A protein has these predicted regions:
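Glycine- and acidic
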Residues: 1-7, 48, 52, 57-70, ...
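Glycine-rich, histidine-containing beta strand-loop boundary motifs that form or position
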Residues: 15, 22, 132-135, 164-166
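Composition- and surface-driven signal marking solvent-exposed, interaction-prone regions
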Residues: 23-27, 134-135, 150-152
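Hydrophobic, Leu/Ile/Phe/Ala-enriched alpha-helical segments that form helix-helix packing faces
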Residues: 43, 119-123, 150-158
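C-terminal, non-catalytic extensions of nucleic-acid polymerases
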Residues: 76, 80, 113, 145-357
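Glycine-centered loop/turn motif at secondary-structure junctions
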Residues: 127-129, 158-159
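Beta-rich nucleic-acid/ligand-interaction surfaces
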Residues: 137-145
């Protein structure tokens, strides 16, 4: 569930180990459920640095692995892999010891999903808005201590334990998978306050994220794009009369340079040795089309750009287009109070204007 828009003071509440908890509540493994529960409890205890409790679980089997607590995170991750693997087996398409043949529609995931629907309605009945729900988390804008406590108490009724991990001071939700947010409060790491969290390729692009949000220095790697195809990629120089002779020698009879199924490229200015980045058609090998996201620009392998010291020939217009596109997404949801300038900051807004000039 997603309600795209810009919001403030958005509490992020996550269920701790939702699917494993659902397995417990359903008693899915009968007499063996308790053993599974111990693994889950041990993982949560380690995650919360309650090592004394973790040492007593699973018959004390983990105690010797916690003598060096610096290895605790690795142990927690190992337990997480085991837990998630068991959950995956409960809904696998093949027979196995963890799958009940009556479980034809993933009862574990269904219990969690139905709970989140119930929670959404319950929060709305309290007079609060719900703007984003994922598998095991809910986001509530303008959240108060009372509504946070309500969510946690509601979870207990169904056997779930919520954790209030962070609150976003600013939150722009584009769709159910893409958002950008500034952290206003964090439960475990105060240094994260004021930093930006992004999801989705558009806002996670390093150039866009740094330019609009984090303001870290732009580095060479930020101006490189990794492209992959299932067939083959070529740099095509057809019709380009300004191709340097050094590059022309590497071309085939069709004025193309084979670069493989994957590669790292930079957009470069006309005349800098770049070509059109094309992918070969899967069925018609004589047919080519622009690799996704590369149309209208010339491209050169990033290694070549660096070797020939052509960094100053990187085409900034490509990155301006990326920034402008991200800005346009944010502006879709702004208003007189929650303006674009307010969201990204007045200084950043001015830099974007300079970029477009």
């Amino acid at each position: 569930y997603a309600a795209p828009g810009i919001y403030t003071d958005v509490a992020v509440l996550d269920v701790a180990s939702m699917h494993p908890t659902s397995i417990e509540q359903l008693d899915l493994f009968g007499e063996y459920t308790e053993k599974f529960s111990d693994i889950k409890k041990a993982r949560i205890a380690i995650k919360r640095k309650d090592f004394d409790a973790a040492r007593t679980l699973m018959g004390g089997k983990l105690a010797r692995h916690l003598n060096d607590t610096s290895q605790a995170k690795a142990l927690s991750n190992a337990l997480k892999i085991a837990i998630n693997s068991v959950y995956g087996m409960t809904s696998a398409r093949f027979e196995n010891s963890f799958k009940d043949p009556r479980n034809i529609d993933n009862i574990v995931a269904k219990r969690g999903a139905l709970f989140m629907v119930e929670l959404k309605h319950a929060v709305q009945e309290q007079g609060f808005q719900v703007v984003h729900i994922k598998t095991d988390s809910i986001k509530i804008p303008n959240a108060t201590p009372e509504i946070i406590a309500f969510v946690m108490e509601f979870g207990v009724k169904y056997g779930y334990e919520f954790e209030h991990e962070e609150t976003f001071s600013k939150f722009c939700l584009v769709n159910d998978a893409v958002y950008v947010a500034q952290i206003g409060w964090h439960a475990e790491d105060e240094s994260k306050v004021g930093t930006w969290e992004t999801t989705g390729a558009q806002f996670q692009h390093p150039y866009v994220k740094k330019f609009l949000f984090t303001h870290e220095p732009i580095e060479f790697d930020d101006m490189c794009e990794i492209k992959t195809v299932n067939t083959a990629m070529y740099l095509d120089y057809t019709g380009l009369d300004d191709t340097p002779m050094a590059f022309a020698k590497t071309l085939n009879s069709n004025l193309q340079k084979f670069v493989g199924k994957a590669g790292k490229f930079c957009p470069v200015k006309p005349g800098a040795g770049g070509g059109f980045l094309l992918r070969q058609d899967k069925t018609d090998l004589q047919k080519f089309a622009a690799v996704t996201g590369t149309k209208d620009f010339f491209w050169l392998e990033s290694e070549m750009v660096k070797t020939l010291k052509l960094e100053d020939q990187i085409d900034q217009k490509y990155f301006t287009r990326l920034v402008d596109s991200a800005v346009a997404q944010i502006k879709k949801y702004t208003n007189d109070i929650q303006s674009y300038e307010w969201f990204v900051g007045a200084d950043t807004a001015r830099e974007v204007e300079k970029l477009a000039a």
